[in-house]
């Protein structure tokens, strides 16, 4: 195989914003290696997001690609109100009061979007403003006012984020905005929901219920772990979510920054064991917002996330508003390809086998992985309606590429985050002979040479969630 022409197995998620929303730039990002377009619904109107979605669908059609759409919710975040002059200066030792009235505030007295915070906080706790740039120590609660002492100097602009570490907040998970955004996403055909600030399993179930009510139960829900309560409940959250995003920005404010690498590894390991997708996000190539080359620490960060076992790596400001969005994607692709070339695939496979469940589908996928390793097969062609077989195979981290052949266009995009999987749209294959014939065609289209071996695997036609067949063949 001409391996220098293969795209990375690790998937790349790109946040789309002013720097990348034109058709020309989106096309360049797709060609550079973008697998998933992330739309951040904390910003922008439905009309603006719809335009981006339609543009991507046009590009997918023109390039015969399957780039997926991820809707990232605003979530139940807390923000400051506005300040006189658009910003305010906090001084160490000053008294600062957080109130419920909607005022244009100053550092002495300002409002926030969550009006019941006074019911949740306790004296001695911290309220962190603007990603922890300003720390407010809660002194006491006076009626509905939270009286704080400022722990450091800092400048805060309008509508900055508020974090309250260690406090279980009392608000409902789904806001009216999120409900409207999720309903819009269902209508627009998005493939993934990144649910922000998930604290408990019920938050995911609330999103799932809304998707079902809107006729889109197949949309996969990625729970963003970005607060201490989410970390505490990660095992239960993982049981009901389709995957996890390690959202290191807010997480690094809510918990000690030195704990974030450990939590990242723990979340990735748990997702790998459960066969759930995992995205590592935030500040991966942050300096490339301004510079054409990453720092060496950033390169190591991306590589180490891949060594940890992440399915996908994500760009935020780098691709949304940075000066070098295409270069950032190209850099991620280069790092991923280099890192994947040094992975210990045998060790990864053994680890997957140790944590595998015992059922027929798992046994078939396990056998496929072992045969692929022993015979050094060029590709695994998985025929799948729902994506089940390809997702199962991805868990085993085979060195061989996994080609998911499906008659379902939605499934081609639903597999966009799964590590090592390339999806292609095909007609329904109901016989073994048809599958064997088509497998050879798409293998050669994906740079498999005549004489190389491939494995063909499939489930029972028309029955989702099964994998019951495998065959080793030589490409003619």
Task: Go through the PLM ranges and name each one.
Residues 1-476:
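Non-catalytic helical/linker scaffolds that mediate oligomerization, partner binding
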């Amino acid at each position: 195989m001409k391996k220098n022409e293969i795209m990375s197995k690790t998937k790349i998620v790109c946040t789309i914003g002013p720097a990348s929303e034109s058709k020309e730039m989106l096309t360049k990002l797709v060609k550079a290696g973008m697998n998933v377009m992330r739309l951040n619904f904390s910003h922008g109107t439905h009309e603006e997001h719809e335009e981006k979605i339609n543009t991507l669908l046009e590009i997918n059609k023109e390039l015969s690609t399957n780039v997926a759409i991820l809707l990232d919710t605003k979530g139940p975040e807390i923000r400051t109100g506005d300040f006189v002059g658009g910003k305010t200066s906090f001084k160490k030792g000053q008294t600062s009061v957080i109130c419920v009235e909607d005022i244009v505030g100053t550092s002495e007295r300002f409002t926030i979007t969550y009006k019941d915070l006074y019911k949740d906080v306790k004296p001695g706790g911290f309220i962190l403003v603007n990603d922890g740039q300003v720390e407010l120590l809660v002194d006491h609660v006076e009626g509905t006012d939270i009286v704080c002492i400022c722990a450091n100097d800092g400048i805060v602009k309008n509508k900055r984020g508020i974090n309250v570490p260690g406090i279980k907040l009392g608000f409902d998970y789904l806001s009216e905005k999120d409900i409207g955004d999720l309903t819009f996403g269902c209508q627009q055909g998005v493939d993934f929901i990144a649910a922000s600030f998930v604290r408990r399993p019920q938050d995911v179930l609330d999103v799932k219920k809304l998707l079902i009510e809107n006729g889109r139960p197949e949309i996969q829900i990625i729970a963003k772990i970005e607060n201490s309560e989410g970390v505490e409940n990660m095992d239960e959250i993982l049981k009901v979510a389709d995957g996890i995003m390690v959202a290191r920005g807010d997480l690094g404010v809510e918990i000690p920054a030195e704990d974030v690498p450990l939590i990242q590894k723990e979340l990735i390991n748990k997702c790998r064991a459960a066969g759930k997708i995992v995205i590592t996000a935030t500040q991966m190539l942050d300096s490339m917002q301004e510079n054409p080359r990453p720092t060496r620490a950033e390169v190591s960060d991306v590589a180490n996330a891949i060594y940890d076992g992440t399915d996908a790596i994500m760009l935020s400001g780098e691709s949304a508003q940075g000066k070098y969005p295409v270069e950032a994607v190209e850099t991620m692709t280069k790092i991923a390809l280099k890192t994947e070339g040094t992975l210990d695939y045998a060790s990864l496979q053994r680890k997957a086998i140790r944590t595998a469940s015992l059922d027929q589908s798992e046994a078939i996928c396990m056998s496929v992985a072992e045969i692929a390793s022993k015979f050094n097969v060029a590709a695994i062609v998985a025929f799948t309606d729902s994506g089940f077989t390809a997702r199962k195979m991805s868990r085993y981290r085979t060195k061989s590429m996994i080609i998911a052949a499906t008659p379902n266009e939605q499934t081609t995009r639903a597999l966009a985050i799964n590590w090592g999987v390339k999806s292609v749209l095909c007609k329904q294959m109901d016989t073994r002979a048809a599958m064997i014939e088509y497998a050879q065609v798409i293998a050669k289209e994906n740079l498999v040479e005549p004489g190389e071996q491939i494995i063909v695997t499939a489930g029972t036609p028309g029955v989702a969630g099964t994998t019951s067949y495998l065959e080793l063949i030589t490409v003619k």
